[in-house]
Amino acid sequence: MASSSGSKAEFIVGGKYKLVRKIGSGSFGDIYLAINITNGEEVAVKLESQKARHPQLLYESKLYKILQGGVGIPHIRWYGQEKDYNVLVMDLLGPSLEDLFNFCSRRFTMKTVLMLADQMISRIEYVHTKNFIHRDIKPDNFLMGIGRHCNKLFLIDFGLAKKYRDNRTRQHIPYREDKNLTGTARYASINAHLGIEQSRRDDMESLGYVLMYFNRTSLPWQGLKAATKKQKYEKISEKKMSTPVEVLCKGFPAEFAMYLNYCRGLRFEEAPDYMYLRQLFRILFRTLNHQYDYTFDWTMLKQKAAQQAASSSGQGQQAQTPTGKQTDKSKSNMKGF
């Protein structure tokens, strides 16, 4: 966005949402913290220039409307045009899983990974029940809620989502093999790399890579160098295809390899058995004698930070509050989390 944040000091959208400060950015534009001047409530505002080459905010707002009411789907307050922007006003959420992973020194315990997996499978399943696939499953697009929703995981960013079947007839989109890669190469399914039309199986496979990213700290195809983006994607694809699932998941419970092998074995139109996948991880969770108490790795760190802050000055409190990295497209905000 060309204009400075200073010029938005008195920018009010939708008649009552006053922009406070920028809290994130992405390929589409910027995300701002805003306040509802009628009741003081904090919200998130997504701004997209009306001159954007590939506008997606209107499409995304329509998708959020279709998904409204689902657990872990942010509530949309307003969509419209203001000055030279398309504007989407929605719930303010907490940090992304990428932010939290960094905050936890890029280490998650098995307990945290399994509690997240349970919610992540359910969020993707809900989107699929509404006849859409997400097509950009990655840690940056899962955000924790704030306040009373601080243990609830939210799925965001539906700009790349696609309808995979007709609402009425349930007719599935046709199989094709001439597609460009949509989404993030690091977490893309093998079929997406091969140019095959994405379907439900691809969202689920991507989630498998996200879980292994959390387990391992990084994936074998990260950090590959190439002259062009196209060549880099090819290298990632080659490495992904040449890394057996058993090698990727070596040293971790067999359930992760079972999950990925199951997803890779799904047919194009086949509905994933979400309950089976949740149960895989739930049974493992119980076997490891964990308690489903919503105590995530960052819960402990936050408590320590709060205790340290309480024993130091007000300024110290500011310093101790984790801010996380403002990742691309992330509505990250640790305040009130």
From Swiss-Prot:
Protein location: Cytoplasm; Cytoplasm, Cytoskeleton, Microtubule organizing center, Centrosome; Chromosome, Centromere, Kinetochore; Nucleus speckle
SMART domains assigned to the protein according to its UniProt record, in alphabetical order: S_TKc
Chain residue ranges for the region called Disordered: 309-337
GO molecular function annotation: ATP binding; protein serine kinase activity; protein serine/threonine kinase activity
Residues bound to ATP: I23, G24, S25, G26, S27, F28, G29, D30, I31, K46
Matches recorded under Pfam families: Pkinase (PF00069)
Biased composition (Low complexity): 309-325
EC top class named in words: transferase
Superkingdom, taxonomy of origin: Eukaryota
Catalytic activity: L-seryl-[protein] + ATP = O-phospho-L-seryl-[protein] + ADP + H(+); L-threonyl-[protein] + ATP = O-phospho-L-threonyl-[protein] + ADP + H(+)
Keyword S-adenosyl-L-methionine assigned: no
Positions of the Protein kinase domain: 17-285
A Gene Ontology biological process term: negative regulation of NLRP3 inflammasome complex assembly
Presence of the UniProt keyword Cytoplasm in the record: yes
GO cellular component, one term: nuclear speck
Annotated catalytic residues: D136 (proton acceptor)
Keyword list, A-Z: ATP-binding, Cell cycle, Cell division, Cell projection, Centromere, Chromosome, Cytoplasm, Cytoskeleton, Kinase, Kinetochore, Mitosis, Nucleotide-binding, Nucleus, Phosphoprotein, Serine/threonine-protein kinase, Transferase, Wnt signaling pathway
Posttranslational mods: Autophosphorylated.
EC number per UniProt: 2.7.11.1
Subunit structure: Interacts with custos.
Family classification: Belongs to the protein kinase superfamily. CK1 Ser/Thr protein kinase family. Casein kinase I subfamily.
Purpose of the protein: Casein kinases are operationally defined by their preferential utilization of acidic proteins such as caseins as substrates. It can phosphorylate a large number of proteins. Participates in Wnt signaling. May play a role in segregating chromosomes during mitosis. May play a role in keratin cytoskeleton disassembly. Phosphorylates protein custos.
PANTHER family, per the entry: CASEIN KINASE-RELATED
Stated name of the protein: Casein kinase I isoform alpha
